[in-house]
């Protein structure tokens, strides 16, 4: 949410649900539209620093920003910043399930096994409340050697062991020289590591005054290398003239060359709000060139659409070539929808002379029943439902939206999506928050639910504000806030998970505590508004999670925590086959006088193992050597070549699949700066 500078109360108008627009796992034939406005040659900066213009299709615009070089962050002097010690007002009245509509949860897990979840590896404090604001909007991501966190109005960079290399710094420091972003520090930040480009993406929104008059901006910066303390390239996009781009969420989608953003849009004239889908021109941004964006206002496609999330790609495998980018939301029947479900849309962007965007409804997936209403006694708008010890102040569960990220993976044989949101684990008789999580899967055709569950062990604890992700082996983890109204259960941090082979629809590895709380928040109900679970690009196994907690009772004394953990089975080689059964006993010798038959000749020796050349392109050199050795081959000549994929194999000879004698040498080409 907005970073403590303003108090904004904007009504989110809801139109009636259009049943004819909802398709059950069937493609839409009428909901996609295309931009047709040309922007000129890609290398052209059109008429200034940034711009936007209407396109011919309803609710669409196109725009651009020039690129601004940023010196290394470790050398930058922090930008001027005025602290404003106030909490924020609620930003919308998004659909909340109504009292009386509650039904039992159809996928609740009442028990949790103990001592199976791995403990934290790294576990250190991140940024605390330097801005005097609430909530912190905690998020961050991990790269090859660093963790970068951006909490509301400040970012910081750490080594993976928690050493601070760039101290907490006002967010607008990242945008020197830009016309608006250099002086406006509004928050709602997102940090992502783009492992396909070997660069970081960091963003926050910006506006002048109190956010009630336009235009409105999105500030985006891309690092020059995989080292976030080095130089960056900044962009200052004017994204709308009259609608505030609140609560933006990003997803990297390389096969569409897009940094894709979704955001609730709040008109300054008080008319109905809507959702927006923005695509920013990734291939030009990672090379620090002027870049364009395309935008679809979803008001023209579905005026009742609630908050949506764009898929964010993880892992070494790219999405399939030209695959559209999934966008999802969860819908509670208690908020006026026909049934509890997940809606799936597909976004496609093109970046020729005439850029285009198409957002098409794929359909919806019925889910096990859930309720996002946590009780009619919760203060309006029925989200402030989490009790704390020693205070009557309840904190915000944000049960009415899918929580960041929508984590995507391409496992080759199938694709997967994972996300979580807060529901009532004790419905209909109770009002205790639990974590609903999903693993969606697609082999061909449409997405479907592979696993789903509500993690709500019968221990009286509330679990809320979660985030989910999957590792390279298909294991899933969910991090979240945990606590209740009885000491010592102050707002803390926990996580749970499942292995790929665990029983379906359960977090069968149980729960582990990341960091206990030590106090309550008494001055504001705001919490979150999001947290972040990511996976380490180095091993594709280690999860990293960050969110807030309370250490000592006070008004808004939040702190943040950054921790990692890893399932031991992830990335391990398959177990060896069982030994063959013992041979049967020899038959008794024949009676004399005939002599026993001669013993059978020994079996021929097994054939010498062959070298079957594996595919190692895209792997780091050490991993490539390991894979070559396991294939009964050996590493030959290693040549270095300039590439954006530093340290990764970009060429091999011979190609994969060739069979040679054992120990045959495979020559490699490795990327360098």
Task: Give the ranges of each region predicted by the language model.
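Sec-dependent, cleavable N-terminal signal peptides
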Residues: 1-35
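Ligand-recognition elements built from short beta-strands and adjacent flexible loops
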Residues: 574-673
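A short acidic, often aromatic-flanked loop/helix-cap motif at beta-alpha or helix-coil junctions
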Residues: 18, 242, 644
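C-terminal PAP-associated
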Residues: 29-573
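Residues at the start of alpha-helices and the adjacent loop-to-helix junctions
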Residues: 5-8, 132, 646
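Short, functionally important structural connectors and interaction interfaces within domains
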Residues: 17, 387-390, 395, 608, ...
């Amino acid at each position: 949410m907005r970073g403590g500078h303003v108090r904004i109360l904007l009504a989110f108008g809801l139109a009636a649900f259009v049943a004819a627009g909802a398709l059950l796992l069937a493609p839409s034939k009428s909901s996609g539209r295309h931009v047709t406005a040309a922007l000129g040659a890609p290398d052209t900066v059109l008429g200034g620093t940034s711009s936007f213009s209407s396109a011919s299709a309803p609710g669409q615009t196109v725009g651009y920003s020039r690129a601004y070089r940023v010196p290394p962050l470790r050398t930058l002097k922090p930008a001027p910043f005025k602290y404003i010690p106030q909490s924020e007002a609620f930003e919308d009245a998004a659909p909340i399930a109504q009292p009386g509509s509650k039904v039992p949860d159809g996928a609740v897990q009442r028990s949790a096994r103990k001592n199976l979840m791995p403990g934290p590896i790294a576990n250190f404090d991140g940024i605390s409340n330097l801005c005097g604001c609430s909530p912190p909007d905690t998020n961050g991501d991990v790269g090859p050697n660093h963790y970068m966190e951006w909490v509301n109005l400040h970012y910081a960079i750490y080594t993976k062991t928690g050493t601070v290399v760039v101290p907490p710094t006002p967010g607008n420091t990242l945008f020197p020289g830009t016309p608006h972003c250099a002086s406006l520090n509004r928050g709602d930040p997102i940090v992502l590591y783009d492992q396909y480009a070997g660069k970081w993406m960091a963003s926050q929104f910006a506006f002048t005054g109190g956010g009630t008059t336009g235009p409105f901006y999105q500030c985006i910066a891309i690092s020059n290398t995989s080292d976030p303390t080095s130089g960056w390239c900044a962009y200052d996009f004017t994204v709308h003239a009259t609608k505030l781009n609140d609560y933006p969420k990003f997803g990297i989608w390389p096969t569409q060359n897009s940094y894709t953003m979704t955001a609730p849009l709040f008109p300054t004239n008080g008319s109905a709000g809507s959702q927006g889908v923005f695509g920013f021109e990734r291939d030009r941004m990672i090379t620090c060139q002027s870049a364009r964006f395309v935008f679809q206002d979803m008001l023209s496609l579905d005026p009742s659409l609630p908050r949506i999330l764009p898929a964010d790609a993880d892992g070494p495998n790219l999405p399939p070539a030209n695959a559209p980018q999934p966008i999802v939301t969860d819908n509670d029947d208690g908020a006026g929808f026909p049934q509890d479900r997940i809606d799936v849309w597909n976004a496609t962007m093109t970046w020729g002379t005439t850029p285009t965007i198409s957002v098409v409804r794929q359909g919806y997936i019925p889910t096990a029943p859930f309720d996002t209403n946590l009780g009619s006694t919760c203060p309006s708008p029925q989200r402030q439902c989490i009790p704390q010890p020693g205070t009557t102040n309840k904190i915000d569960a944000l049960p009415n939206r899918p929580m960041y990220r929508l984590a995507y993976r391409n496992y080759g044989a199938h694709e997967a999506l994972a996300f979580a949101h807060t529901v009532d684990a004790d419905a209909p008789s109770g009002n205790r928050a639990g974590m609903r999580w999903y693993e969606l899967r697609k082999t061909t055709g449409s997405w479907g639910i592979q696993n789903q569950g509500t993690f709500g062990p019968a221990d009286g604890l509330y679990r809320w504000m979660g985030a989910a992700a999957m590792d390279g082996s298909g294991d899933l983890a969910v991090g979240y806030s945990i606590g209740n109204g009885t000491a010592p259960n102050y707002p803390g941090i926990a996580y749970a998970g499942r292995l790929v082979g665990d029983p379906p629809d359960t977090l069968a590895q149980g729960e582990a505590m990341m960091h206990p709380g030590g106090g309550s928040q008494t001055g504001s109900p705001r919490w979150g508004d999001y947290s972040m679970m990511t996976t380490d690009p180095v091993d594709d196994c280690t999860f990293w999670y960050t969110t807030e907690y309370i250490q000592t009772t006070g008004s808004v004394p939040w702190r943040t925590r950054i921790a990692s953990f890893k399932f031991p089975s992830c990335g391990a080689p398959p177990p060896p086959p069982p030994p063959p059964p013992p041979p049967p006993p020899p038959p008794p010798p024949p009676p004399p006088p005939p002599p026993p038959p001669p013993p059978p000749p020994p079996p021929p020796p097994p054939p010498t193992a062959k070298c079957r050349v594996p595919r190692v392109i895209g792997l780091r050199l050490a991993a490539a050597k390991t894979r070559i050795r396991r294939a009964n081959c050996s590493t030959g000549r290693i040549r270095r070549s300039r590439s954006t994929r530093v340290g990764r194999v970009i060429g091999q000879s011979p190609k994969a699949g060739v069979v040679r004698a054992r120990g045959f040498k495979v020559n490699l080409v490795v990327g360098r700066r």
